[in-house]
Regions:
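Segments of small-molecule ligand-sensing domains
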Residues: 170-185, 191, 195-255
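Structural motif
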Residues: 22-25, 73-86
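Sec-exported extracytoplasmic/periplasmic mature domains
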Residues: 7, 31-36, 57-65, 85-92, ...
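Extracellular/periplasmic periplasmic-binding protein-like sensory domains
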Residues: 9, 108-188, 199, 247, ...
C-alpha cells in the first residue's frame, strides 16, 4: 500500500479504502451474505486488477480456500461471455469482480446474455459513474464496497455536511445528488484530520505536521468517530469495520438491505 512505502520518514496518510483490506472484506462478505464457497475471479487486466487478484487469492489462502478460476478482461471488451462461461463450467457460485464502470457493466450484461444468475461481489469500481445506465436492470445485483453512504440515518456531522452541500450547490437536492459519496466523505474527513494535525503542530512545517497526525486524539468525523487514527506504524485511518456494502437501486447507491 502507498501508506507502507518504506520511506523514513513516511509522509503519506490516508482516509480511504485499502485494497488488501477490501479483498479480505469481499471474501468475508460473500461467505456471510451468500453462504457460498466456490469463488471465481473476474478481473480487469491492469495493475489494479492484478493487485486485487493477489489480495483475494491471499485472503482465500488464509482460509484454506482457493478460487475455482481466475479470468481477466480488457477495459475495452464488450463481451465477457467466454471468460464467464469458463468460470461457470468450473463451478463458481459467486464472482469477485474488479473493474471500473464500463468494463464492470459489460460483465453484468454478459451474465444477462448467458442467463446466469450468480452473486457478484465487487470492489468500488461500479460506483464511479453511469453503471445503471450501462449495465441495465441487473446492475442492482452487484454488491460493492463503499466507505460511506449519505442515505439512512445520519450522524450530526452527516446532517451538517448534507446541509452545507445543499446550501453551496443548488443542484444537490438530496443524498442521491452527492456523487461520488465516498470521494466526498473521504476528502472531508481527510481535510479535517489534516487541519487537526496542523493545529497540533502549530505550524505548516512538514515534519511538524507529520508528528501532529500522531497527536490527534478524538475526532467526530463524517465516516466515523476517530480515536487516535494514526500511529508511526499505522497511516490508514479506516479499517474493514468502516466499510459499507452497497448496491444500485433506481440509480441511487443504497446500503444493502435498505432497498424497498
Amino acid at each position: 500500500p502507498i501508506t507502507k512505502n518504506s520511506a523514513n520518514p513516511n509522509y503519506v496518510f490516508r482516509v480511504s479504502a485499502v485494497d488488501e483490506i477490501v479483498d479480505r472484506g469481499m471474501v468475508d462478505y460473500a461467505q456471510n451474505t451468500f453462504k457460498t464457497s466456490k469463488f471465481g475471479l473476474i478481473m480487469v487486466n491492469n495493475p489494479w486488477g492484478e493487485s486485487n487478484e493477489r489480495g483475494i487469492v491471499a485472503a482465500l489462502t488464509a482460509k484454506n480456500m482457493k478460487a475455482v478460476g481466475i479470468e481477466k478482461f480488457e477495459g475495452s471488451d464488450v463481451d465477457v461471455t467466454p471468460q464467464l462461461s469458463r468460470l461457470r463450467a468450473a463451478g463458481a457460485d459467486t464472482l469477485f469482480m474488479v473493474g471500473n464502470v464500463g468494463p464492470s457493466a459489460q460483465v453484468v450484461k454478459s451474465l444477462d446474455r448467458m442467463g446466469w444468475k450468480v452473486p457478484v461481489v465487487s470492489h468500488w469500481g461500479p460506483a464511479g459513474g453511469r453503471f445503471t445506465e450501462l449495465a441495465g436492470p441487473s446492475a442492482r445485483d452487484v454488491h460493492f464496497v463503499q466507505t460511506y453512504s449519505f442515505f439512512g440515518k445520519q450522524s450530526p456531522t452527516g446532517e451538517k455536511v448534507i446541509a452545507a452541500l445543499k446550501a453551496k450547490y443548488p443542484d444537490i437536492k438530496g443524498p442521491e445528488d452527492i456523487s461520488p459519496a465516498v470521494g466526498v466523505a473521504n476528502a472531508y474527513d481527510a481535510m479535517k484530520l489534516t487541519a487537526l494535525a496542523i493545529q497540533q503542530a502549530g505550524s505548516t512545517d512538514g515534519d511538524a505536521i507529520r508528528e501532529g497526525f500522531y497527536k490527534i486524539g478524538k475526532y467526530d468525523g463524517l465516516i466515523k468517530t476517530y480515536e487516535k487514527p494514526f500511529t508511526p506504524e499505522v497511516h490508514d485511518a479506516l479499517t474493514e469495520k468502516d466499510y459499507v456494502w452497497a448496491q444500485f437501486v433506481d440509480n441511487r447507491i443504497l446500503p444493502v438491505g435498505m432497498a424497498k
